[in-house]
């Protein structure tokens, strides 16, 4: 369902076991891209340094709502024991409960203490109502980093693991995916959302062009995001079954680039690259803002768009009840029997599913070659397409295959070649006469 949210400044459109022990494949090297300590500080600052932190939850809440819909759309989903990985303030928990999920235990894991306990002082009355309605109270687990071992949760004890817009700050995605899989029961589900590589592409382009023009060099100001193909590969290599990955884009309109950067900072989504530049001149930012508005600005309301690509992923812990592909060679019928014809238009014999133009050694031969081997005069092709006009080029020769698979040079081409040879002979004779 497409949603449109309006607020001042923007417009939303369409809306110990170590992790490393779980590596399932070779040639794997952990890369450290993000400074996790800085990211924790940035998340804490969204609570301590912002007057109204809830004012900047609009993007997290929107994606959490969509992710909750996807969770409950799964047929016969079991929400008994649930882990919210990178839960922030627990927005996903709220939406899942509102949509009627039956939860026995709910664990919230977060590296930011301020963000994890942000809403505790404001929900005392809600907790009393929840107790009266027999709703589950979440168990909150604070970790130093999302890549650390989660204490207090046993292996194969969870029915569902969910994560909303947190995994894009993890350095060791393969290790974390493998570690989460160890916590799932057989047939348990892992479902998450994270930012994709097209996120904030307008901001990246504008800062790049401005810094190149004003300072003669460039350093990354927007953290790199994961490709959708990489997510699928990580799921498969960690032995998740029935992996599925899809994506959508959310576009938010802001008054200018500085409003966008302010909101990103107050969300805790500002840059956290390990080797980032600590200072950029005011002149460069002003130039970037002008470039942003010139290249991507909306003419109707003088605003600028910001694109957020959301990647959704789902994977299952293996179980014998899940669908599995048939073993190779177990088919009882040839695929061609479904239509009764081959790809060349020939019908197959009733007693055999092997086409007559294939030998027993499965080496492809043409029909005329097979007839020659049997001493039969090859039949002349009646393919009218041979006489059709063909493009004439000087850099390559065009050959045509009839539906028997035989090569045919075009008659026009043969005639043209003969004319060229005659012309060359005539020119040579005239040249000899002139020499004499």
UniProtKB/Swiss-Prot annotation:
The UniProt entry's GO CC annotations, sorted and at most eight, read: mitochondrion
Q: What is the effect of changing residue 235 to P?
A: Unable to complement a ndufaf5 mutant strain
Q: Where does the transit peptide start and end?
A: 1-25
Give me the stretches of Basic and acidic residues compositional bias. 391-411, 421-436
Q: Where is this region: Disordered?
A: 365-436
Please give the Gene Ontology molecular function terms for this protein: methyltransferase activity; oxidoreductase activity
Spell out the Low complexity composition-biased ranges: 369-380
Extract the Gene3D superfamilies matched here: Vaccinia Virus protein VP39
For this UniProt record, the keywords arranged alphabetically read as follows: Methyltransferase, Mitochondrion, Oxidoreductase, Transferase, Transit peptide
Q: What is its EC number?
A: 1.-.-.-, 2.1.1.-
Q: Which GO terms describe its biological process?
A: culmination involved in sorocarp development; methylation; mitochondrial respiratory chain complex I assembly; negative regulation of autophagy; phototaxis; sporulation resulting in formation of a cellular spore
Q: Which InterPro entries match?
A: Malonyl-ACP_OMT, SAM-dependent_MTases_sf
- The answer, when asked if Transmembrane helix is one of the entry's keywords, is no
Domain of life, source organism: Eukaryota
Q: Which Pfam families match?
A: Methyltransf_23
The annotated consequence of gene deletion is: Defects in development due to mitochondrial NADH:ubiquinone oxidoreductase complex (complex I, MT-ND1) deficiency. Increased autophagy.
Principal location = mitochondrion
| Protein location | Mitochondrion
| PANTHER family from the UniProt entry | ARGININE-HYDROXYLASE NDUFAF5, MITOCHONDRIAL (PTHR13090:SF1)
Outline what the protein does.
Involved in the assembly of mitochondrial NADH:ubiquinone oxidoreductase complex (complex I, MT-ND1) at early stages. Probably acts as an arginine hydroxylase. May also have methyltransferase activity.
Q: What is the protein name stated in its UniProt record?
A: Arginine-hydroxylase NDUFAF5, mitochondrial
């Amino acid at each position: 369902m497409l949603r449109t949210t309006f607020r001042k400044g923007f417009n939303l459109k369409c809306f110990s076991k170590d992790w490393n022990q779980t590596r399932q494949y070779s040639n794997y090297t952990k890369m450290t891209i993000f400074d996790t300590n800085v990211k924790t500080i940035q998340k804490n600052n969204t609570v301590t340094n912002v007057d109204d932190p809830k004012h900047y939850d609009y993007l997290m809440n929107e994606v959490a709502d969509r992710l909750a819909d996807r969770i409950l759309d799964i047929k016969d989903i079991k929400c008994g024991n649930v882990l919210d990985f990178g839960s922030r303030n627990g927005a996903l928990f709220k939406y899942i409960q509102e949509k009627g999920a039956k939860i026995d235990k709910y664990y919230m894991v977060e590296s930011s203490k301020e963000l994890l306990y942000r809403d505790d002082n404001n929900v005392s009355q809600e907790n009393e109502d929840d107790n009266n309605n027999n709703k589950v109270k979440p168990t909150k687990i604070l970790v130093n980093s999302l890549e650390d071992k989660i204490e207090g949760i046993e292996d194969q004890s969870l029915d569902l693991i969910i994560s909303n817009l947190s995994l894009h700050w993890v350095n060791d995605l393969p290790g974390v995916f493998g570690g989460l899989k160890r916590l799932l029961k057989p047939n348990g589900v892992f479902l998450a959302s994270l930012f994709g590589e097209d996120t904030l592409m307008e901001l990246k382009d504008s800062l790049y062009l401005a810094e190149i023009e004003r300072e003669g060099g460039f350093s990354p100001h927007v953290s790199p995001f994961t490709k959708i193909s990489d997510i699928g590969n990580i799921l498969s290599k960690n032995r998740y079954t029935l992996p599925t990955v899809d994506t959508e884009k959310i576009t938010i309109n802001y008054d200018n680039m500085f409003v966008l950067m302010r909101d990103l900072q107050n969300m805790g989504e500002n840059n956290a690259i390990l080797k980032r530049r600590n200072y950029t001149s005011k002149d460069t930012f002003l130039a970037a803002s002008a470039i942003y508005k010139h290249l991507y600005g909306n003419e109707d309301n003088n605003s600028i768009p910001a694109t957020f690509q959301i990647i959704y992923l789902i994977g299952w812990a293996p179980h014998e009840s899940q669908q599995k592909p048939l073993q190779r060679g177990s088919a009882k019928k040839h695929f061609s029997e479904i239509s009764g014809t081959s790809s060349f238009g020939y019908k197959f014999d009733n007693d055999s599913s092997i086409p007559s133009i294939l030998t027993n050694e499965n080496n492809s031969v043409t029909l005329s070659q097979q007839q020659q081997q049997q001493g039969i005069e090859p039949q002349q092709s009646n393919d009218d397409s041979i006489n059709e006009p063909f493009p004439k080029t000087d850099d390559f020769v065009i050959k045509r295959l009839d539906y028997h698979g035989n090569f045919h040079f075009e008659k026009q081409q043969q005639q043209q070649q003969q004319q060229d040879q005659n012309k060359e002979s005539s020119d040579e004779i005239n040249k000899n006469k002139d020499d004499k």
